[in-house]
Regions:
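Active-site loop/oxyanion-hole signature of alpha/beta-hydrolase fold enzymes
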Residues: 50, 54-92, 259
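Catalytic histidine-centered segment of alpha/beta-hydrolase-like enzymes
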Residues: 242-258
């Protein structure tokens, strides 16, 4: 995969397909290639750009030691767009990627053609209470003690909430030991800190791009009403609830998810 020097880091990315640009942003810890169920479909219709965000698991983007924010990662994305000569693009963000996508649409409205926000929130206060500790937050959403956070246990809880039982067993049995050996869990402090600082609620009304907010009815990692709030505050937003889908709708309900996204991007 090629790399681009953007915003002070070397960012690993991939481009497939032809057509209007579509940039996919993965959730906390996930690398760009985790979009495989979407890329193989979307590349038939769009120029699909995926990338490894800072501190992504199994990624090859630089992992800076200094703290950063969602706005920082939105700036990374703009830098990649500039590197690729992309003036405007459709933006699809899943989970943490949706938080980055909101920052991008708020701060760079002229660069966003259409926006898709999947399984995401606009504030750390909308994260499921069971997962607050993973992001170093106390129950009142104030910053807790980073040193006391058992990241492996926290991601185990998140995975159990996000995936059906079969996928959960696969992830815990196969991927978690690899992540442990590579020191990935301990490297996630940067992304977790960015999630803890997420707060775009009061700026959602400034988003100009036509927006699809899509969430599963069995969502447990983030509070379901977060999507309803986003859809109500973003002008020209459409809310879709995928019946039976969990936080991991892009994997478990991939056919329905892909169809909803393509229908939205092609509409109007």
């Amino acid at each position: 995969m090629p790399k681009a020097r953007v915003n002070g880091i070397s960012l690993n990315y991939n481009v497939e397909g032809q057509g209007e640009p579509l940039i996919l942003m993965m959730g906390c810890g996930g690398p760009g290639r985790a979009w495989f169920f979407q890329t193989r479909v979307f590349k038939k219709h769009y120029k699909v750009v995926t990338f490894d965000a800072r501190d992504a698991a199994f990624g090859k983007t630089d992992n800076p030691s200094e703290p950063y924010t969602m706005k920082t990662m939105a700036d990374d994305t703009i830098g990649l767009m500039d590197h690729l000569g992309i003036d405007r693009a459709h933006i699809l963000g899943f989970s943490m990627g949706g938080m980055i996508a909101q920052e991008l649409a708020i701060n760079y409205p002229e660069r966003v053609q259409k926006l898709v926000l999947a399984s995401t929130v606009s504030s750390a206060s909308q994260i499921a209470p069971e997962l607050l500790g993973l992001f170093g937050l106390d129950e009142d959403f104030s910053e807790g003690d980073w040193a006391s956070v058992d990241v492996r246990q926290g991601f185990g809880s998140a995975t159990a909430l996000a995936f059906n039982s079969r996928l959960y067993r696969m992830l815990v049995g196969l991927l978690f030991p690899i992540c442990d050996r590579l020191g990935w869990f301990e490297r996630l402090k940067g992304q977790r800190g960015a999630v803890a600082g997420c707060d775009t609620l009061d700026s959602l009304h400034t988003i100009r791009a036509p927006t699809l907010v899509i969430v599963g009815t069995e969502e447990k990692c983030v509070q379901l009403h977060a999507s309803e709030v986003m859809a109500s505050r973003i002008p020209n937003a459409k809310l879709v609830k995928v019946d039976g889908a969990s936080h991991a709708q892009i994997f478990e309900m991939r056919s329905r998810f892909n169809r909803e996204v393509l229908d939205f991007l092609r509409s109007g």
